[in-house]
Every structure is written in C-alpha cells, then in structure tokens.
Amino acid sequence: MKLGEFDIQPVTDGRFRLDGGAMFGVVPKVMWERCCQPDDQNRIQLGLNCLLIRIGRKNILLDTGLGDKEDAKFQQMFAIERMPTLRDSLKMEGLQPDDIHMVINTHLHFDHAGGNTVREDGAVVSTFPKAKYIVQRGEYEDAARANERTRASYRRENFTPIAHVDQWEFVDGETEVLPGVTVMVTEGHTRCHQSIKIESEGQVAFYLGDLIPTVSHLPLPYIMGYDLYPLQTLETKRWVLDRALNENWLLVFEHDPRVLMGRVRKDVEGKFYLEEVKP
C-alpha cells in the first residue's frame, strides 16, 4: 500500500505459538482467552509480520522473524508454521536477499532477528549480504551480555555473524536512518527496544515491534510477562497510543495473527480500539 512516497507491505515469516499467560502477564486467563483461544498446552497463535518498505530502488526490511536455522525440537516447542517463510514472502514481492539494502531490528530476540542469518554449508552467515543492519547500540550490548533472565531470548547466531562481516550500524536514541524513516526508542519490553516511524506527505505508519504485539494488547494494562520493564512499557504505550490517536497514525502489529494494521480510536468510555486497515 502507498504511504506518501513509500510503498509499505507486510511480509510474513509464518506463525508460531507462545504461552498465553506469558503473553498477557498479570491479566487473568479468563479475560485474555476471550480474544486468544489457547491450545491444550496453553499456547496462543501469533503472527511473524515483518514489514517491507520500498522507496525508489531501495528496499528496507523491518525485523526478520524466526528464520529457519532451528532444529525440530525448537520448531515443535513453538508450533512453528513456515508457509511461507520470509524469503518466500520476499520472493513473491520479486525480491532476492541481495535486493535488501537495509534491515532494521526492533530488538534482537529470536522471533525478531532469527532471519538475520542463515545456515549455509555448515556455517551461519548473513541472510542479506548487501544490507546494513540497524539496531540500538544498547540493545546489541544487552544481547551480547545476556544474563540468566534474558539468555533464552537472545541467540548469538542471530547477530554475531553480522558483526564478523561489519554489517551492523548501531544508533543511539531517536535517529532518522533514511529520509522519512526514523527509529524511536520505545523501552519497556527491553531497555533499548525501538519502533520505526515511516512518514511521508503528512502520513505516518508506526511499526510497533513488541511494544504492542497484537491488537489484543491495546488496553494499557495488557502487558507481556516477557517485558523486562513493564511499568516503562505502560508509560511508553500511553504516549504512543495518545500520539497515534491525535495524529492518525497507521499502526502495524508484528505478532497479531489476523490483523496487520489499523488506526486507533477511543470509545465513549475512553478505551482504545482499532479500526482495521487492509494492506
């Protein structure tokens, strides 16, 4: 779809499942299961919705999904459905890995950066060899020195091979990485999580990452148990949603399995809801 001078298109890396309780934190199951039906292992289905941005001859990719390096045990644990993969989705858009000029990671958890690298001839290498990969410097540092709480989410094979070939470009805070494409720190899920603002001709799209992973997480207290700083998530959500409402932003949801994007509104009780926009 057109957004001013940009063309933006969701590209999927498939679907997977995570524990519903972890996805909704302190929200009781009796409330969250109204919108997200769990399976017999209490897992809910989630999308892997990356975003392709095109302007002129440049192709920018926001997040890279899970990738395909993991073994059968990992795939079973997370009930991964890989039809299609991200590379399949890009191919349907007429693109090969060499055609991607920039990859922006919201953060480096395995379901957002797993497709950064690929296994070839027994080695793990960059999936997009001609791209600059962009992430907050603090996020990379936290991933590189992950602790007992965070280690399961950060898998070194998703980011260290890119450092070996000097494809990383680290940013510190809000940065316009291309004219009209700005990364903004939206801390809470991680210390240096970032979301991406795309702006052209008075129109704005905002790729949320894990700040608001699904439409079901629009209510302010609906915060993931995975978030390292949940009270910061609360405040970040508040200002993002208020600004999105006042400025009519198009919000893009990375993990919703059904709704990809929409514009936030408020009902008579002052609660946020979404008007879906089809891409």
Language-model features: where?
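Cap/insert and terminal regions of metallo-dependent hydrolase folds
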Residues: 77-88, 201-279
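Conserved nucleotide-sugar donor-interacting segment of glycosyltransferase catalytic cores
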Residues: 114-130
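Residue-level marker for buried hydrophobic side chains located in beta-strands
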Residues: 60-62, 104, 133, 205-207, ...
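Active-site metal-binding loops of divalent metal-dependent hydrolases
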Residues: 13-15, 64-67, 108, 138-139, ...
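Conserved beta-strand hairpin/beta-sheet module of binuclear metal-dependent hydrolase folds
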Residues: 2-8, 12-93, 195-210
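Short, P/G- and charge-enriched loop/turn segments at secondary-structure junctions
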Residues: 36-41, 121-122, 183-184
